Amino acid sequence: MYGYLRETDDSTAINFSAYGKFLPGENTGFQLLTIGAKFIRIFRVNPYVLKEPGEDNEEWQQKTKLECMFSCRLLNKCHSIAVARVPQLPDQDSILMTFDDAKLSIVSINEKERNMQTISLHAFENEYLRDGFINHFQPPLVRSDPSNRCAACLVYGKHIAILPFHENSKRIHSYVIPLKQIDPRLDNIADMVFLDGYYEPTILFLYEPIQTTPGRACVRYDTMCIMGVSVNIVDRQFAVVWQTANLPMDCSQLLPIPKPLGGALVFGSNTVVYLNQAVPPCGLVLNSCYDGFTKFPLKDLKHLKMTLDCSTSVYMEDGRIAVGSRDGDLFLLRLMTSSGGGTVKSLEFSKVYETSIAYSLTVCAPGHLFVGSRLGDSQLLEYTLLKTTRDCAVKRLKIDNKDPAAAEIELDEDDMELYGGAIEEQQNDDDEQIDESLQFRELDRLRNVGPVKSMCVGRPNYMSNDLVDAKRRDPVFDLVTASGHGKNGALCVHQRSLRPEIITSSLLEGAEQLWAVGRKENESHKYLIVSRVRSTLILELGEELVELEEQLFVTGEPTVAAGELSQGALAVQVTSTCIALVTDGQQMQEVHIDSNFPVIQASIVDPYVALLTQNGRLLLYELVMEPYVQLREVDISATSFATWHATAQNLTQLTSISIYADASEIMKFAAAEKSMGGGGGGDGEVSTAENAMMKKEQHEEAILLHGEDDDFLYGDEDETIMEQNFPVENGEATIKQSNTRKRKRLGHDAIQSSRGGEQSDAIDPTRTFSSISHWLIVSHENGRLSIHSLPEMEVVYQIGRFSNVPELLVDLTVEEEEKERKAKAQQAAKEASVPTDEAEQLNTEMKQLCERVLEAQIVGMGINQAHPILMAIVDEQVVLYEMFSSSNPIPGHLGISFRKLPHFICLRTSSHLNSDGKRAPFEMKINNGKRFSLIHPFERVSSVNNGVMIVGAVPTLLVYGAWGGMQTHQMTVDGPIKAFTPFNNENVLHGIVYMTQHKSELRIARMHPDFDYEMPYPVKKIEVGRTIHHVRYLMNSDVYAVVSSIPKPSNKIWVVMNDDKQEEIHEKDENFVLPAPPKYTLNLFSSQDWAAVPNTEISFEDMEAVTACEDVALKSESTISGLETLLAMGTVNNYGEEVLVRGRIILCEVIEVVPEPDQPTSNRKIKVLFDKEQKGPVTGLCAINGLLLCGMGQKVFIWQFKDNDLMGISFLDMHYYVYQLHSLRTIAIACDARESMSLIRFQEDNKAMSIASRDDRKCAQPPMASQLVVDGAHVGFLLSDETGNITMFNYAPEAPESNGGERLTVRAAINIGTNINAFVRLRGHTSLLQLNNEDEKEAIEQRMTTVFASLDGSFGFVRPLTEKSYRRLHFLQTFIGSVTPQIAGLHIKGSRSAKPSQPIVNGRNARNLIDGDVVEQYLHLSLYDKTDLARRLGVGRYHIIDDLMQLRRMAFYY
């Protein structure tokens, strides 16, 4: 058996976050970096996101959101990160990342290509540094010096690697020193940081020279130590400069404090300690659990009654530290300083806000805090400083005996103005005390669906009756996951294929395309134009669709395109021969086109209309208001376009035109960019306004820091500095000065309001609305793409051989143009000299058709259309490019470039090749050159703003989301779509109208607003607020069984007295943090409202854990089928070491009852059929052939359910602890906590159960989840483990390595860098494949897909593979590393091989699993690289594309 593994959706959890200048460019501002397992994202803070009027407000408002600017996926998990400025890139921040086991990569964003480039690679892995260990390594830690002098990496916990950043060095040379060489006691490193304010880079280690445990705390405590080590990076010398011993034994984390305070904070589970080399230490204790276990002097804050284990912290400013606890609370730790402000006297600790359970905290721009979470949604918070005054409880006695002479002293006006009534204010200050507090509010949140603990499939919700098809072979379902933890616990409902809610549907024969045009005052559409083969149908939109009786539009011929001008006030219709302009119920103008050839394509963007005729002629019209409103033709023959197009190399047929209105301010001329300091303004007025705004911000900031009196006395310091050194006209210098000042102020009280302090380059749409520029994109038959300015029609950008789809598009230089012209002339001469036969001519025509750009558009996507995306259709594929600012040496041309996005959208469902191996004809219909556009941009559909719908055989929605950039979602549940238009109506707000291909049905629909389409997998998240352990769908009653728990503090201990267990209550003081074992409950959730069904809750006993929850089909005589589906649960009573562990098996059925009034979902009740305590812990359940298979610790029992009782049939002794069972007919796989996996066989005739085979590898890692891989008559077994491996086994008794069948043979092993806890098996998808007969469909369906979800929120699948496809893809996987460089320099084999890496006898064939994440990089290569790589493999490129697309579509599901 061969397999194919691919991760389809990126992780949503966030492990690391950092703030810095990661995007190149002078005016790009600062960004937030997040890394979740393998997914890197870079965000900017955008304060200009428009929020539509709601119930609270009547006007549009602007809110702040995080906007993804860049994203990419690594091959393996990142363990630690740091941010530094390296000498190679002094103007931007670089990212240092560590990987298994001791690898370090330094990466940054490349300015020219806007991709992740690798600056330096360091591998510290060798046998000597390992000291003989092969696993259980300490993860590599990387830290950077605050002054950017060097970085340090902890290697295997025993060595330190130093990376000096020498200014004049071209490369970064590292060296490794053993920690024992620095100091013999330096061992068991818990954490390390660089200290700020030292002359040389100084590393502070937190370590434990002699370890202790909680069990030995009464004998040995206060074992933690710190050591400050100064690093001389020139001489490679180390010197110990600071040591402190006898710190509390629970210390685990260090937080460096920047100067002027300096020093570091040490966080423990119960304590916080501040250490400084020049100041005596001070600390505080947070509970009474530590009484008697430390002699360190600590301030008593035991009344807080909390712990800081698993906490995270970050330094904010002015002696404030934010601390996030494991319960999801945000605390403020203040360093109280002496009157001089230089030394810390004490610590204050208080709760300030409730957040998600934080895993990382990062201070962004002043006043902004990012909370990264692995267990819940990540949040962007804004905080402001509030100062309140209160009277002191004790007032000083006032002095009565005042000197009468002193009162008579007269003060002149200057003294009064300068010093005021100082004495009176002094006395008032004594009577009042100022309290400072931080006020937080949430600005934005990044949704997280991880960690996925359990997963099941359920009935499709939100499924319209029009989409229900009885003949459909493929099932439609929802994927429901149990996500989050604690108060972040949630149910997530996922829909792979978009399912629009159909409002109405009607048959419309002969219709080809449709457009909704014209706007009423409430922004709803007036008309629906439907183009037919030889005519046009006009429908008026109101309460119903009614055919328009008035002759406003042209109905006697088919419509080519329709749109709106003047912001929707004018409706435009373009037919084959004329243009109609309609407004307010009357036709304003009808323009007859002066051409002998019909119009085949049109583009309508306010205020221009561009037309393309069948002979390739371009016509341009502009809407003018003088002397009256009309469309006026622009004389193209008088522009430079005519002379440019007439030249020899440009004299080719035009194949596509489109107009783009740029609101992003990216499309600027390169020459103008240089003269204006990096394109910082747009025009002089805007630049001046920006400078004024920045000066105002800095003035407000200075008032916060110094006060208004300083300005009055000494003048405005900001203005003086800027006037002396930086001219106001120079936008670049002003921005640079602003950034410099803000970075210096981070250590002080520089908290700003949300507007203007984001350090972001986001554009304000209210400011740029008047400066929108228009451009014409023209594609030529020879594969060239050109951009022209409107209305001048000047050539401002050219892309040569666009049909080659390179990874980077740049402007065509004069030299390249001349070279292309000579090559074309040689090719023409060669073709003229050699006569061609008919077959070769057909082949040439097909090749030209494959290279032709059939459609090319630039679409403004994302927030405020700030992300221009170039979309083009080449060779029946949609390619996507993102535009970014870049330098351009050609004067008068645009300073932009395009980078290819890793998305592959294929527009055909059949294979590219015929049975004879030749290119199959195009599926896209082109009649006489006329073809309707497939790319349909829209401003808003439901909750999606500025998206694109691509129609055709595989309809696809494209969303450029703020969450993670470009996402693609297929909408194949209604089959192919031939027409689409956005539609707004009073009854259907922001809906859609589309037309199906097969039945020609017109559907008015809306997308479900509850779902988040910016996620890689559209999801609806239902917050439950409890930890969800199991979720199972019960099909017969259409409800979900959900097992959840909440922690419940307990002071009870159970002991055995006279063979009976008894409770002992241990009284603790009120400041003791009691253990909180989970209290489990079972609820039924209805999919109607996604809330718990009333009166169905089952509570379990204290200390009883639900370990298994399954729906099982058991033999029954009361049903026709002979099987009855029940809900089975297994529990464990764990009362401690003395009490014998027991468990229960509970069998329930869900019955239907009469619902209670006003509670429609209360029509279900749980009826318990069987509930009995067992002699051991019940740890796993499943049904096998109508019987109940039950894991009880190290045994497996099989039961028969009869007469509401369980009768034992057979049992089997296993290894240590069986915790998961999966069955298929009469076989089952059992996962053991320590001994991997076993295959169990049950022989019903003999009532015998036996171990057929098992995984006996000594190096097998502790397993997490298992599932079957089914390929028709063949079965394989999947196993995921704690190190992120996925292993595939076979039962092959005839193979010599299987030892006669006793050993499961390892077919494949791969490490995906994330832990998998949930599998679901689905049958193969056939709807997207062109299959000829039923046998082929059945074979595909029986080749089942195993879908997995990880603890990081990512999804993927494993599929069986035919040997022919495997061999082709295996060769591709071997060679692709030589063509595509991997991010961070990760080697494909090294980073994806199973961990720990060691040769095993049973792993000879561990290469039989194709890594889909690697081989699918082939789809994103240029045409030249694809062809070259395919030639090296001995096949055509279409063979590989067909294989990969077939695998994608078989693994897709509704």
From Swiss-Prot:
GO terms for molecular function: RNA binding. Its main location: nucleus. GO terms for cellular component: mRNA cleavage and polyadenylation specificity factor complex; nucleus. Residues 736-765 are annotated as: Disordered. It is found in: Nucleus. Keywords: mRNA processing, Nucleus, RNA-binding. GO terms for biological process: mRNA processing. Belongs to the CPSF1 family. CPSF is a heterotetramer composed of four distinct subunits 160 (cpsf-1), 100 (cpsf-2), 70 (cpsf-3), and 30 kDa (cpsf-4). CPSF plays a key role in pre-mRNA 3'-end formation, recognizing the AAUAAA signal sequence and interacting with poly(A)polymerase and other factors to bring about cleavage and poly(A) addition. This subunit is involved in the RNA recognition step of the polyadenylation reaction. This is Probable cleavage and polyadenylation specificity factor subunit 1. It comes from Caenorhabditis elegans.
